[in-house]
Amino acid sequence: MKIGYPCVNETLPCSAAGTFRLASYSEERLLTTVASNLACLRQILEWNVSQGLLFFRMGSGIVPFGSHEVNTFPWQEHFRADFQALGAYIKQHDMRISFHPDQFVVLNSPDPSIVQRSIAELVYQGSMLDLMELDSTAKLQIHAGGAYGDKDAALARWTDTFHNHLPDAVKARLVVENDDRLYSLRECLGLHERTGVPILFDNFHHECLNHGEPMHEALRLAAGTWHPSHDGVLMMDYSSQAPDERKGKHTDTLVPELFESFLADLNGLDVDMMLEIKDKEASAVRGAQLLRAAGLLPPMPAGYEVPVFADRPAPAPPKKRTPKPKAPAAS
């Protein structure tokens, strides 16, 4: 089992997502920004290793405009050695890496231009995993997409795009996540049957949208879509409901009681767990402590000290909802 957090480390004084406006694009600016992003990414990975956090989702913006037609510079060749060095470090420490392209990546859009741009973005992000020389257990995570008034037709378009338009290198890395509004675990299982794509399981989305499958059963159904040799163990996202907020809003910080209750649902299932929680690495460190206490992670080396996140703002208190005043009765 591995545990981690996505994209941004709020402890370190650097960003791996530096960018600039399209209007100010230049090769010089691109090179400077990518070099800075890669240097920060190395710092993040080293910090994660020091804390035993061996699952990390890299941000999509390492190379600004990486899939945009304006970017014609051969950045893959220019930064090949840098990516290879990152990959060597990742493999040395048995880390697992993923990307989660932005919501504009939609494979079942009825607009062919959106699908074309989505494929270009997947190719770009997959190429970074290839440059790091990571095997196919490093994944590209997307949602099933929209329904567009006809979910069956939308699923058919997704299937057609997968089989007939995606490069094999992208297919080997692609996983689909159950969401909280449109495509449940059951519908993602249907996509798996049509395409073989593994399902990245999101426990919180399953709580929001399901067909009555208990959590322990849902976990095993999703895990059964992953091939041990070329997919690895089940990747999953973990979060819980933010108190007194709209349904589906993620919690600001890890709630130990809910996390421990979820661990019971695993019942021995091996997973790599991404915490989609607002305070990022702070919750990941706390989650790792709970996993060690449960015997699910190895102990840290002698002398390890748990970091203190005292400079973090406290989670916002629940919003007080004041009822709207009633309109005066008609006289």
Where are these regions (language model features)?
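Conserved short-loop catalytic and cofactor-binding motifs
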Residues: 146, 176, 275
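Active-site segment flanking the S-adenosylmethionine/decSAM binding pocket
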Residues: 192-198, 204
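Short, glycine/acidic-enriched loop or turn micro-motifs at the edges of active sites
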Residues: 103, 180, 205
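Domain-core and long-helix interface of multi-subunit machines
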Residues: 152, 175-182
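Short acidic, Gly/Ser-rich segments with clustered Asp/Glu that frequently serve as metal-coordination loops
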Residues: 183-184, 204-208
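Residue-level marker for buried hydrophobic side chains located in beta-strands
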Residues: 97, 174, 199-202
